[in-house]
Swiss-Prot record:
<dbReference type="Pfam" id="PF00189">
    <property type="entry name" value="Ribosomal_S3_C"/>
</dbReference>
<keyword id="KW-0699">rRNA-binding</keyword>
<feature type="domain" description="KH type-2">
    <location>
        <begin position="39"/>
        <end position="107"/>
    </location>
</feature>
<dbReference type="GO" id="GO:0006412">
    <property type="term" value="P:translation"/>
</dbReference>
<dbReference type="GO" id="GO:0003735">
    <property type="term" value="F:structural constituent of ribosome"/>
</dbReference>
<comment type="subunit">
    <text>Part of the 30S ribosomal subunit. Forms a tight complex with proteins S10 and S14.</text>
</comment>
<dbReference type="InterPro" id="IPR036419">
    <property type="entry name" value="Ribosomal_S3_C_sf"/>
</dbReference>
<dbReference type="InterPro" id="IPR018280">
    <property type="entry name" value="Ribosomal_uS3_CS"/>
</dbReference>
<comment type="similarity">
    <text>Belongs to the universal ribosomal protein uS3 family.</text>
</comment>
<keyword id="KW-0687">Ribonucleoprotein</keyword>
<protein>
    <recommendedName>
        <fullName>Small ribosomal subunit protein uS3</fullName>
    </recommendedName>
</protein>
<dbReference type="InterPro" id="IPR015946">
    <property type="entry name" value="KH_dom-like_a/b"/>
</dbReference>
<keyword id="KW-0694">RNA-binding</keyword>
<dbReference type="InterPro" id="IPR009019">
    <property type="entry name" value="KH_sf_prok-type"/>
</dbReference>
<dbReference type="InterPro" id="IPR005704">
    <property type="entry name" value="Ribosomal_uS3_bac-typ"/>
</dbReference>
<dbReference type="InterPro" id="IPR004087">
    <property type="entry name" value="KH_dom"/>
</dbReference>
<keyword id="KW-0689">Ribosomal protein</keyword>
Amino acid sequence: MGQKVHPNGIRLGIVKPWNSTWYANTKEFADNLDSDFKVRKYLTKELEKASVSRIVIERPAKSIRVTIHTARPGIVIGKKGEDVEKLRKVVADIAGVPAQINIAEVRKPELDAKLVADSITSQLERRVMFRRAMKRAVQNAMRLGAKGIKVEVSGRLGGAEIARTEWYREGRVPLHTLRADIDYNTSEAHTTYGVIGVKVWIFKGEILGGMAAVEQPEKPAAQPKKQQRKGRK
């Protein structure tokens, strides 16, 4: 059977940035890693209904900065910023250093693999037919400009006795092309028949120039100079 490498892991440092960007010496590394895990676990549980796509953690000069990428920033911030202040205090207690929380809005949740997977999961838990949920996700992504999308669900689909896997793809999803900007994520639907796994791959286009192109806008290409023909004497 064909085995596939994790699409995000193989592209780290090529076209994908890390979710934790900090440096620590040998003594502090394990503590930082543990607090990162606890912060992510707490925020994921606390913001379960806030459509959180990604949590980025930075550690500048004995402090911690957490950026929450969400499709519903209003739910995270709360009334007059009360909810985000509560989150900041808990994160500071977990990490043991002063904390800062930034909110980044996801403009197109239909093109975010994590949010698409979570959307399909919630539909499956509400007993929506899995084929309808998959097709709707694919159509929405392609309508908003995705170059390709693949959705896979596996488990006791429709309450069947034997578990199986079904997938639906539209466009192209080049997993072997390292410069391809492929967003991949998974989710689990807990139904009365058991757990149904959901995987989503979204191809947004190719990134030329590696990480430098991801962080900086592309410069216009220089036009070649026209050669002047010398007249005969």
